[in-house]
Curated annotation (Swiss-Prot):
This is Probable nicotinate-nucleotide adenylyltransferase. It comes from Bacillus cereus (strain AH820). InterPro entries: Cyt_trans-like, NadD/NMNAT, Rossmann-like_a/b/a_fold. It comes from the Bacteria. The lineage of its organism: Bacteria, Bacillati, Bacillota, Bacilli, Bacillales. It catalyses: nicotinate beta-D-ribonucleotide + ATP + H(+) = deamido-NAD(+) + diphosphate. The gene is nadD.
């Protein structure tokens, strides 16, 4: 059976923290690949101003293009409305019955697991992989595999704020993503 990691997110913008997590889990669990799963409208972020799907996808392509073992999965972008992990993973497990999926989440999402839509059924479809994130614990009543990663305290919200305040984001996200953001005037206001 193939082992594939999935890291879902808004990726608004994608940064070195996302890439570090994906790479560390890839090696720790001996995965075949890691798929980045950009979402349409995450249920926990409804109502927030999110950068266009086209821009987020372009930035994600730029961020992941150098890694052979990273791919982008468009499953959630093909649906309108809120993206529920259960619905996505149900589709993916039917589409790829020979794959064991490892769904990678940060400590913030580990704490949020009890509120996930259809969590009990989702546990039958994936193995959750929790990675530590500053300020969060990996304690949950649900079974998760934990992977220790070097601490890298960067988030998409921090980067959006830094761009808004006209602060440098060098060394926090790939240079090609930085150039795209600056050329397209993203996160300026």
């Amino acid at each position: 059976m193939r082992k594939i990691g999935i890291i879902g997110g808004t990726f608004d913008p994608p940064h070195y923290g996302h890439l570090l997590i994906a790479n560390e889990v890839y090696h720790a669990l001996n995965l075949e690949e890691v798929w980045f799963l950009p979402n349409q409208i995450p249920p926990h972020k409804q109502g927030r101003n999110i950068t266009s799907v086209e821009s987020r996808l372009q930035m994600l392509e730029l961020a992941t293009e150098a890694e052979e073992h990273f791919s982008i999965c468009l499953e959630e972008l093909s649906r309108k409305g809120p993206s529920y992990t259960y619905d996505t993973m149900l589709q993916l497990t039917k589409k790829y019955p020979d794959v064991q999926f490892h769904f990678i989440i940060g400590g913030d999402m580990v704490e949020y697991l009890p509120k996930w839509y259809n969590i009990e059924a989702l546990l039958d479809l994936v193995t959750f992989v929790g990675v530590a994130r500053p300020g969060y614990t990996l304690h949950t009543p649900y079974p998760i595999t934990t992977v220790e990663i070097p601490e890298f305290a960067v988030s998409s919200s921090l980067l959006r704020e830094r761009y808004k305040e006209k602060k440098t984001c060098k060394y926090l996200l790939p240079e090609k993503v930085q150039v795209y953001i600056e050329r397209n005037g993203l996160y300026e206001s």
